[in-house]
From Swiss-Prot:
InterPro entries: SMAGP. Residues 1-27 are extracellular. It comes from Xenopus tropicalis. GO terms for cellular component: cytoplasmic vesicle membrane; plasma membrane. It is found in: Cell membrane; Cytoplasmic vesicle membrane. Residues 49-90 are cytoplasmic. This is Small cell adhesion glycoprotein homolog. Belongs to the SMAGP family. Keywords: Cell membrane, Cytoplasmic vesicle, Membrane, Transmembrane, Transmembrane helix. May play a role in epithelial cell-cell contacts. It is a single-pass type III membrane protein. The chain crosses the membrane at residues 28-48. It comes from the Eukaryota.
Length: 90
């Protein structure tokens, strides 16, 4: 049995051209995914940086310095005037 060429077979050029289009499409998809991941990472780093900058640990109070000193002296006087009562549990 011999294989005879038929007239309805697809030419060689069409096969290579179609596979070339698929390769270009796959490259575009891979490039898009890599770009999306890269943009997401940059966004996360920026958000973490902004959060850490805003919550860096320096706290401001609206109390005057005189009020702070007065409250400290009151606490010291209060603890000196009241005798400590110790409770013992049995």
């Amino acid at each position: 049995m011999s294989i005879l060429p038929t007239t309805d077979s697809v030419p060689e050029e069409a096969i290579t051209k179609a596979s070339g289009d698929v390769d270009g499409f796959e490259k575009a998809v891979v490039g898009g995914v890599i770009a999306a991941v890269f943009i997401t990472l940059i966004t996360v780093v920026v958000l973490i940086t902004v959060y850490l900058y805003k919550h860096k640990g320096s706290y401001r109070t609206n109390e005057n310095l005189e009020d702070v000193e007065a409250s400290k002296t009151l606490q010291m006087e209060d603890s000196a005037l009241t005798p400590e009562k110790k409770e013992y549990f049995m």
